[in-house]
Design a protein with these regions (language model features):
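ATP-binding/phosphotransfer module of carbohydrate and carboxylate kinases, centering on a glycine-rich
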Residues: 1-59, 69-73, 92, 96-100, ...
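Conserved A3 ("GATE") glycine/threonine-rich loop of ANL adenylate-forming enzymes
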Residues: 12-13, 108-110, 134-137
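A short acidic/small-residue loop/turn micro-motif
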Residues: 33-35, 82, 154-156
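A charged helix-plus-loop insertion that forms the helical arch/lid used to bind
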Residues: 73-84
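General beta-strand structural signal in soluble alpha/beta enzymes
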Residues: 102-106
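Glycine-rich phosphate-binding loop of actin/hexokinase-like ATP-binding domains
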Residues: 122-181
Length: 332
């Protein structure tokens, strides 16, 4: 039985554990703040601790940003503080110190692999995983094979334009999905609408008074006030639901998945709202057979399962599916 050191690295949190190819975690899951400016050192420190627990056979990492899986480094990492860190080499220091193979994957593609191997795929041949976090990202796995794209940048689903006439944008993309529906986008959209929608700008609701008093505006605040009956917050979330359906519908028409799983903080904390909105509006935007929609059963550990799915994918340990040479080769 192989023992794999697993790392689920996010922009904010850094999770680690030891797992086996069948999906079992054999050590406690540790969680700490991500230290992007010393990420290599942070990995090495945790690996030292893991080596004292088990004799490790490999290291698998799910990481955000622009990832070069073949070279084993992160090309670009955007920190929560807005810094851009370029070229974080993860493979070389690990191989040099521990002499272990290292398998690295972008967190969105890795999450889709985690769903394929360890989620609720059942008998579906094709799935999409969507993460609604600070932004929106995702991955596609079709018949066991992840879609990475020409330069391994596939999965930037949050940059699909769902409102091309809008003034809002993300990463320079006008009307980008995540500019409205992500953890960062929801409050930005609400603030923009409050400034530009004459119907609501003078409304004396709890929500608009909160904004007028310069109280904190965040996605949780929007959901909290909507649940309390605030008409403006409810109106905003109703429109956001349609934008979500437009994004998911576009993906369905492009990839025809049998299953779409949803994860990330916005989804995990607002499951009923997200699923109800998609079920209500998806037929407006989806021509192909509608997929099964479900919250990911992997929860907050999806990054770790994604790392383990990456290990399975790269080593060809995929039961019942023939793996082509390009997928079964290591990233050495």
């Amino acid at each position: 039985m192989a023992f794999v050191a697993l790392f689920g690295i996010g922009s904010t949190n850094f999770h680690a554990t030891i797992g086996t190819p069948n999906g079992d975690f054999v050590s406690d899951v540790s969680s700490e703040p991500t230290q992007p400016h010393r990420l290599e050192t942070q990995l090495l420190e945790r690996l030292e601790e893991m080596q004292s627990l088990r004799s490790l056979d490999a290291v698998a990492i799910s990481a955000p940003g622009l990832v070069d899986a073949e070279a084993g480094h992160i090309r670009k990492f955007d920190t929560p503080a807005g810094d851009l860190i370029e070229h974080i080499d993860l493979r070389t220091p690990i191989e040099s110190r521990f002499d272990l193979p290292v398998y690295l994957e972008n967190d969105c593609t890795a999450s889709a692999l985690g769903e394929w191997y360890f989620g609720r795929r059942e008998d579906h041949d094709s799935l999409i995983h969507l993460t609604f976090g600070t932004g929106i990202g995702g991955g596609v796995v079709d018949r066991g094979h992840p879609l990475r794209g020409e330069s391994a940048q596939a999965g930037e689903f949050g940059l699909l334009s769902v409102a091309p006439e809008s003034e809002l944008s993300s990463t320079g993309v006008t009307g980008a999905w995540e500019a409205f529906c992500s953890g960062r986008g929801i409050p930005e959209y609400v603030a923009h609408r409050l400034e530009t929608d004459d119907e609501w700008s003078a409304d004396e609701s709890v929500f608009t008074r909160r904004v007028a008093e310069d109280a904190e505006l965040s996605a949780p605040v929007v959901f909290e006030d909507a649940k309390s009956g605030d008409a403006f917050a409810q109106s905003c979330l109703a429109q956001i639901s349609r934008y979500n359906a437009a994004g998911v519908g576009t993906l369905c028409n492009a990839f025809n998945p049998g299953l779409v799983t949803l994860g990330g903080g916005v989804a995990l904390n607002n499951e009923e709202w997200l699923l109800e909105g998609l079920e209500r509006h998806l037929e407006e935007f989806c021509f192909v057979d509608q997929p099964t929609l479900a919250l990911s059963p992997l929860g907050e550990n999806i990054g770790l399962y994604g790392a383990l799915g990456t290990y399975r994918d790269r080593t060809g340990r995929q039961p019942g599916v023939e793996v082509p040479q390009s997928a079964s080769s290591t990233t050495d």
